[in-house]
Amino acid sequence: MVNVVLGSQWGDEGKGKLVDLLVGKYDIVARCAGGNNAGHTIVVNGIKYDFHMLPSGLVNPNCSNLLGNGVVIHVPSLFSELNNLSEKGLKDCDKRLFISSRAHIVFDFHQHTDKLRELELKGISKDGKNIGTTGKGIGPTYSTKASRSGLRVHHLVNDQPGAWEEFEAKYRRLLKTRRERYGDFEYDPEEELNRYKKYKELLKPMVVDSVFFINNAIANGKKILVEGANALMLDIDFGTYPFVTSSSTGIGGVITGLGVSPRHINEVYGVVKAYTTRVGEGPFPTEQLNEQGEKLQTIGAEFGVTTGRKRRCGWLDLVVLKYSAMINGYTSLNITKLDVLDTFKEIPVGVSYSINGKKLDSFPEDLINLGNVDVEYVTLPGWDQDITKITEFDQLPENAKKYLKFIEDFVGIPIEWVGTGPARESMLHRDV
């Protein structure tokens, strides 16, 4: 059985908290896409754990964790993250972590050229805007993957005669093409290669044929939870291109990033922030560049875990949610951070887009059109009540229930969980 947790907006919805809540019921937690450009925080027994690349199932000592073939791995960051978790009391994480032999490696020069590429794109952009990359080398690594010149984990850990020499030769060719593309930037390949000789031995015990690993687990009745990274609106195909990440962040990325058949996927949980946020540039129809937006940002503590950047804030956009639900096929929803709306007297919700008075039937793929939409709002009454101490769904204020019911009715998907505060236990559940 495979269940999936996916972000429905532009990321930072609180996926990790739901995974943390569910992980005790699963044998394996897997990631299928992205790298250390993701970021979420989990609080367990008062200890805060920051996750970027690693599956958050590591907080459960009885759970195995998998980085699938669709993930791109910056090896130094992987070990740094493992060390940080160990220092905070999570033991034997390296023994509970398995890494796909097919996953591609992010080198330091990928990160360096990521920033150069950002400057280049800004220079040719009509409005001079950045894509908003995290600078972690994710895009350049997926680029070399697509051009069939990248290096995978199995290239690094192979012990056959001549394998290291082949790895080194491919590495140098890859670096040479980067320098031809971006100029002779300052870089020490010998230092990086020496580091990878050491990483090779440390990585080897964790590396598996992930396609066999996960399908064998399915065949043996293991329960698997897939932890999506980023969110649908950052998907390379379905997001607000080019202000997106470089991988498939929706349900398609689960299939291609793990090698799992669609027929094995059971539940798909869509995580939805009760309002909308976005990090970096790109269109954001319901953004509030006013006191309301600042209030959402302040109360919601909207700063990125990975970048530290302020998140842009706006009202819940049900056009976005309906679009992502259509693609990902959510079976139920988790509404997060509902408590951030506690003090708002009125809460507008975006329900449709129009251009020049003409209502749009679908989410615009063209950013010029998207940047010119007028949003139709329905304004719902607030509840003006602290909900952070509430422990049962039925105890929510009537207007909070009406807000949730409006969402359910609009998208036609039941809400199974509601987040009412930052604490681990601040999550209401109801049977759907």
From Swiss-Prot:
GO cellular component, one term: cytoplasm
Residues annotated to bind Mg(2+): 12, 39
GO biological process, one term: 'de novo' AMP biosynthetic process
Pathway membership: Purine metabolism; AMP biosynthesis via de novo pathway; AMP from IMP: step 1/2
Entry GO MF terms: adenylosuccinate synthase activity; GTP binding; magnesium ion binding
SMART domains reported for this sequence: Adenylsucc_synt (SM00788)
E.C. code: 6.3.4.4
Binding site for GTP: 11-17, 39-41, 311, 337-339, 419-421
Cofactor requirement: Mg(2+)
Annotated residues for binding of IMP: 12-15, 37-40, 134, 148, 230, 245, 309
Catalytic activities: IMP + L-aspartate + GTP = N(6)-(1,2-dicarboxyethyl)-AMP + GDP + phosphate + 2 H(+)
Function: Plays an important role in the de novo pathway and in the salvage pathway of purine nucleotide biosynthesis. Catalyzes the first committed step in the biosynthesis of AMP from IMP.
Cofactor note: Binds 1 Mg(2+) ion per subunit.
Species: Vanderwaltozyma polyspora (strain ATCC 22028 / DSM 70294 / BCRC 21397 / CBS 2163 / NBRC 10782 / NRRL Y-8283 / UCD 57-17)
Subunit structure of this chain's protein: Homodimer.
Binding residues for substrate: 305-311
Keywords noted in UniProt: Cytoplasm, GTP-binding, Ligase, Magnesium, Metal-binding, Nucleotide-binding, Purine biosynthesis
PROSITE patterns: ADENYLOSUCCIN_SYN_1, ADENYLOSUCCIN_SYN_2
Name used for this protein in its record: Adenylosuccinate synthetase
Family per record: Belongs to the adenylosuccinate synthetase family.
One Pfam match: Adenylsucc_synt
Location in or out of the cell: Cytoplasm
Primary localization: cytoplasm
Active site (catalytic residues): 12, 40
